[in-house]
Amino acid sequence: MRKKVGIIGGGASGMMAAVTAAGAADVTILEHTARIGKKILSTGNGKCNYTNRTLSKDDYYCDHPSFVAHALSQFDDQAASAFFAAHGMLTSEKRDGYCYPYTGQAATVLNVLRMLLEEKGVTVKTEQKIEGVTAGKDGFIVKTRTDRYRFDKLILACGGNAAPQTGSDGSGYALAKSLGHTLRRPYPALTYLLTKDPACKELAGVRANALLTLYVDGEKVQMEEGELQLNKDSLSGIPVFQLSHRAVQALAAKKKTTISVDFLPQLGEEELLHMLTELQKQYRKQPVEEVLALFLNKKICGALLHRLSLPFQQEMQTVSDKQLKKLAKLCRHFVFEMSGYPGFDKAQVTMGGVPVSEIDDTMQSGKVRNLYFAGEIIDVDGRCGGYNLQWAWTSGYIAGLHCCDQENVSENRETERESR
């Protein structure tokens, strides 16, 4: 007799779990919004960066990296690309290993999954607000505002708190807790960072390639290079997103959090000083601002001069050697103190969730038999660049595969958790 598998959450991980399980079970997705897969449509600026060719466990934040490594060994970036290619989606690979549908439209990825669900006979129930889940010897009872369902196996793929406008409202956390699981406090990740530094106001609108270094209580923590976007009260752009996990953790813990910006990462400090010295000889009578603008955005020039209290129109020949050294140093170490971070509505993913120490390598709960987890509800979050969607595919595939096994409880589950 075919088992009944219920999946709470119709996002990327829930749909992958459903497609995987559908061949061996009767699968029902319960989605609390009016449509499935809404968050997929906003990924990659609407282009859906669905995985990354540089994939490794080091691209994820997780208390037990071996958990992620084992999961990726079962379904990695090549498996994800092969899956979509096998179902008709042409793909393209961009810089840094970013992979997209060839159409450049996130809807293509969603349509593959949506059509597969229909072809495989998966029942999709939308607008199902979950009111409670009860686990018993005979399976699970899921109560919604309008219906009552019984399942032999249950997969929680409810997502996190990030981007609540797409349906990710954190409701799955309460369900996990009601079934005996603990929770790592959720925080926004892959987000911009706030600052009260007045320099941001004059730098608003600037985009510049830069090397960013995150310091927490004076200790260097992480470095990222890419296009920095400066706004009137925040730093943004991919390098900031990459720093945001550790920065948000530090800010939440009330630690001093600063980001040092190198506006000329292609030059060493001595090389830059030599260049400034030569330019001083060449343009003796020219305003220092105009000379700096030969290689820096003019707004950046203004911020540098303001911070050093140098007049914009001061002639280069009157700038002292000491001032030139300070200018060279500031170009490569322009420090912003961060004051906070925005809410979940401005974040791409959630850090925190159900600890992996409570989940085995089949994505099954270590507390409740036949309960599985997939996606962002698990305390695993990745870097920007397709890694979080890959985690959705990976964890969804593993949960969907193993929830259909006749004997799906690992006898070594306790050993697995203790070894991580």
What are these regions (language model features)?
Residues K3-I29, A399-C404:
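N-terminal Rossmann-like FAD-binding beta1-loop-alpha1 element of flavoenzymes
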Residues G6-I8, I130, Y149-Q165, A176, ...:
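Short hydrophobic core segments
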Residues A22-N45:
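Glycine-rich FAD pyrophosphate-binding loop
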Residues N45-E93:
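Glycine-rich active-site loop/strand segments that organize a redox cofactor
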Residues K125-T126, C301-D381:
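A glycine-rich dinucleotide-binding beta-alpha-beta segment and adjacent secondary-structure elements
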Residues T126-G139:
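A conserved short coil-to-beta-strand element within the FAD-binding core of flavoproteins
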Residues K153-A199:
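Glycine-rich loop(s) and the adjacent beta-strand/alpha-helix scaffold that form part
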